[in-house]
From Swiss-Prot:
Name the record gives this protein: Ceramide glucosyltransferase 2
Enzyme active site: D285 (proton acceptor)
SUPFAM superfamilies (alphabetical): Nucleotide-diphospho-sugar transferases
Species this protein is from: Caenorhabditis elegans
UniProt KW Acetylation keyword: no
InterPro entries linked to this entry: Ceramide_glucosylTrfase (IPR025993), Nucleotide-diphossugar_trans (IPR029044)
Domain characteristics, as noted in the entry: The D1, D2, D3, (Q/R)XXRW motif is a critical part of the GCS active site, involved in catalysis and UDP-sugar binding.
Annotated gene: cgt-2
CDD domains linked to this entry: Glucosylceramide_synthase
Tissue expression profile of the protein: Expressed mostly in intestine and vulva.
Transmembrane helix is among the record's keywords: yes
Gene Ontology molecular function terms on file: ceramide glucosyltransferase activity
Length: 443
């Protein structure tokens, strides 16, 4: 070793033979640690094999069952709390809000069409236009709209016929001419069967402008009070099972919009390619939300539910509609195929009762009874919040139809799974995985 003395400092300069190359140091480290780790590898493999041999798959299933059903309970609580927080809040008029272009795609007429459409002519909003879209000029609904235009001449309204063929989604094709000439910053899509409260457009616009990045506002689907078994059945479905998921999903910022009554910022939608960009999808509402979210925009819900008020509800039409939605979800999100049939009351009751019985030897019948009581109580509370007034039917009728709907739900899923083709209006659609329309056949 050579010493170099500079003033009071002594620097030790190692000889060349003492300086080891970096690669040599790595080799030494490897030779040091490899034997240390290599002796544990057989032990690790042996331990893993023993765990796999000794694992109790029933215990794993039971633990998964408790976690899964607990998540469903959590959604119940979140949906109810968010409904109490968000629904039926008063909205003050605000003349600084931007104008709204309301697009109404219409096919056919029923006994409630005039009443439903009139609520848009009389809406309490300072600046809006009504854009009615018809596939054919001889549609029976044309005369209904013409009579309302004559009754309310001061309302800015326009009718379009024939649509514009830009893709396989007939609703997008029908609305395209109206979208092209819409003159306001906010675009609202509203189905013909929606009954609108006088301040609902105001509320949706206020919600939209409450946050700079808000670009999509929807109304939670519900139903106006109507007579008839099928109408009550539909109302209970939308007031319980559907409302719970919709409210909880929006609270947790899941993408779950429905297009029956929705409002978007035209500028944000144009960034995504406008209506034309979604003409290849049948569930355009879902993909509106997905694309807007991918660009950093937020979505929210109005304080007023969307009041569906079709006069032509039958059990067959309702079943076909729900079945069509199940098929859409299966095509768009195939990962939920195994989860969807288990999320209703009675399938989840069997899961949690088996799980708790296996893990803690808790009586299965007791668990099922407590589960059903919790489920129906929470559903009833959610529906009361959606209704926001006295129910139009008795508690006994609610109980009987609720039970029937819950028993009916697995059968709807089975029907949807057996025939993935989707019949809508006068067309049959076949979807590819991901939700894109693969083919369309007229019937």
């Amino acid at each position: 070793m050579g010493d170099k003395i500079t003033g009071l400092e002594v620097e030790i300069i190692p000889e060349i033979s003492e300086v080891q190359p970096e690669s040599l140091q790595e080799q030494n480290a490897s030779s040091l640690y490899y034997p240390l780790f290599s002796q544990y590898i057989p032990l690790l493999l042996t331990g893993t094999k023993k765990i796999l041999e000794d694992i109790d798959y029933c215990t794993c299933f039971a633990v998964f069952g408790v976690v899964f059903v607990s998540a469903l309970y959590f959604l119940h609580i979140v949906g109810l709390c968010y409904g109490k927080y968000r629904l039926h809040r008063p909205t003050k008029p605000n003349p600084s809000l931007p104008g709204v272009s309301i697009i109404k795609p219409i096919i056919g007429a029923d006994a409630n069409l005039y009443t439903n459409l009139e609520t848009f002519f009389t809406t309490q909003y300072h600046k809006f236009e009504l854009l009615f879209c018809f596939d054919r000029s001889d549609d029976p609904a044309v005369k209904v709209v013409e009579s309302l235009v004559k009754k309310y001449p001061s309302v800015d309204s326009t009718m379009f016929f024939g649509g514009e063929k830009i893709g396989l989604n007939p609703k997008i094709n029908n609305m395209m001419p109206a979208y092209r000439i819409a003159k306001y910053q906010l675009i609202m899509i509203s189905d013909s069967g929606i009954f609108m409260k006088s301040d609902a457009v105001l509320d949706m616009a206020s919600t939209m402008m409450s946050h700079e990045t808000m670009a999509l506002v929807t109304q939670t689907p519900y139903c106006k009070d109507r007579k008839g078994f099928a109408s009550v059945f539909e109302q209970i479905y939308f007031g319980t099972s559907h409302a719970r998921i919709y409210l909880a999903g929006n609270c947790l910022q899941f993408n779950c919009p429905t297009g029956m009554s929705s409002m978007m910022k035209k500028e944000a939608l144009d960034e995504c390619g406008g209506f034309a960009a979604f003409s290849g999808y049948l569930a355009e509402d879902y993909f509106f939300g997905k694309k807007l979210a991918s660009r950093g925009y937020k979505s929210g819900i109005s304080t007023h539910p969307a009041l569906q008020n079709s006069a032509a509800v039958t059990m067959t039409s309702f079943t076909d509609r729900v079945c069509r939605w199940v098929k859409l979800r299966m095509a768009m999100m195939p990962q939920i195929i195994f989860v969807e049939p288990l999320q209703d009351c009675f399938p989840s009751a069997l899961i949690i009762s088996f799980s708790l019985n296996y893990i803690a030897n808790i009586d299965m019948l007791t668990t099922i009874m407590l589960h059903v009581v919790f489920w129906i109580t929470m559903d009833c509370m959610v529906m009361c919040k959606m209704q926001n007034k006295k129910m139009s039917f008795s508690p006994l009728k609610f109980l009987l139809i609720w039970l029937l709907r819950e028993l009916f739900a697995p059968l709807v899923f089975i029907k949807a799974a057996l025939d993935p083709s989707i019949r809508w209006r006068d067309n049959v659609f076949h979807l590819a995985w991901g939700g894109k329309i693969r083919s369309q056949t007229s019937i």
